[in-house]
């Protein structure tokens, strides 16, 4: 090979190497900014109940669920808040330091973004509350419908208006009336 071809080959190899390094760095940077969405059940049990598809400790994720009634603990001296979030399954603990949204309440839907610091504990950097009683983030709504359907839970069950719920209310009322007499 003559010297001219060698220099051209070096330039071409250098350009290809540079493009490969740049592409690798871009993919690495993008992977650091991807926040995968999970429900609390998926964090504990894995996606589709597959333990191999659980998020890893240290991974950035987004979690959508409902704030468990009676689980909110506030630090009196700081803005630290800790609460449980669940869907229809197990709960996870969410730690957050900052001002919570005005619409944050127990029993309401939230989406928390942060880092998983233990298998069932999230250190949140952002907490979003749902906007009104009918709003639910689309990704959370889809996941909950999927899980509810698999568990045999209907929309009427969730609203407390199913035939089973009405029968349970009637039984409870009869029991209470019997105790009152």
Swiss-Prot record:
Localisation per UniProt entry: Cell inner membrane
Compositionally biased intervals (Basic and acidic residues): 135-148, 156-166
Periplasmic side: 30-181
Binding site for heme: 131, 135
GO molecular function: heme binding; metal ion binding
Transmembrane domains' residue ranges: 9-29
Membrane topology: Single-pass type II membrane protein
Principal subcellular localization: membrane
Family the UniProt entry places it in: Belongs to the CcmE/CycJ family.
General function of this protein: Heme chaperone required for the biogenesis of c-type cytochromes. Transiently binds heme delivered by CcmC and transfers the heme to apo-cytochromes in a process facilitated by CcmF and CcmH.
Protein name: Cytochrome c-type biogenesis protein CcmE
Source organism: Actinobacillus pleuropneumoniae serotype 5b (strain L20)
């Amino acid at each position: 090979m003559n010297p001219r071809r060698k220099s051209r080959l070096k330039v071409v190899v250098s350009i290809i190497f540079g493009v490969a390094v740049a592409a690798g760095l871009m993919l690495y940077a993008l992977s650091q900014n991807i926040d995968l969405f999970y429900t609390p059940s998926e964090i504990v049990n894995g996606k589709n109940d597959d333990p191999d598809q659980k998020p890893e400790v240290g991974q950035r994720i987004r979690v959508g669920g409902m704030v468990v009634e009676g689980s909110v603990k506030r630090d009196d001296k700081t803005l630290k808040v800790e609460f449980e979030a669940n869907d229809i399954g197990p709960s996870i603990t969410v730690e957050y330091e900052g001002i919570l949204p005005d619409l944050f309440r127990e029993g309401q839907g939230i989406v928390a973004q942060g880092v998983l610091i233990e298998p069932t504990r999230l250190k949140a950097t952002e907490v979003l509350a749902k906007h009104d009683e009918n709003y639910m983030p689309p990704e959370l709504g889809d996941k909950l419908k999927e899980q509810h359907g698999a568990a045999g839970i209907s929309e009427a069950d969730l609203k407390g208006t199913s035939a089973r719920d009405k029968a349970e209310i009637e039984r409870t009322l009869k029991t209470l009336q019997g105790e009152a007499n």
